[in-house]
Amino acid sequence: MKEPKVHVGILSETKIEFIFPDTYRVNEKEVSGKQLVLFDNGKILWKNNRYDELLFEPLREETDSFELLDVTIGINFHWERKENQRFHGALKFIVEDEKITGINVIHVEDYLTSVISSEMSATASLELLKAHAVISRSWLLCQLKVESGKLKVAMQHNNAANSQLLTLNSQLNKDSQLSTSNFQLIKWYDREDHVHFDVCADDHCQRYQGITRASTEMVEQAIQATRGQALTYEDKICDARFSKCC
């Protein structure tokens, strides 16, 4: 089976600067060096031409990379800031909500290598990294299988570990409040929150910062040791989402 690719939304701005240290190809042309795209009347303006979308693909997929400048990380958290980030894979630009959205198209296992290096320390123990790899892979593959609908879950005020999760009506407005005092409204994020890509790169989904964060041999070993493994229940991939403790 061919390894799937995931479309990861990285940033959305009216102006995006990026750099190709290596040669990439777009519309049968080769490009390199510093680049700029601008939102212009519903189109993407690049090198004095307007496009509905652009797809830059690496000539050497395993080694080539690109850099996005001023990517906002930790959105709405106390550590929110901008930084330059580097990525393997392809770079796609689309128009979305009067802005340009930059999307990284990357193999699932390469994506996971970055996730477990970005979500936690790349120097953690091998067994912890392996467990995280399986959990993150399970969550991702489950989201890729979702076809429609946003899930919202109510949790009873009993012990959280033993609480029964109840699926609410999918038509419930995601910003509404549940009036019943016996329940607490919990928002579950799904890939359907993103229309034009599979997952985003920030804490809304899983923290993904490309090859910006240094990986380690231990991370590579954890990915290889668990390659393709996911948690299942009754032949279905588990939605193995996890919470943050900040």
Regions from the PLM with identified roles:
Residues M1-C246:
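Conserved, single-site charged/polar hotspot
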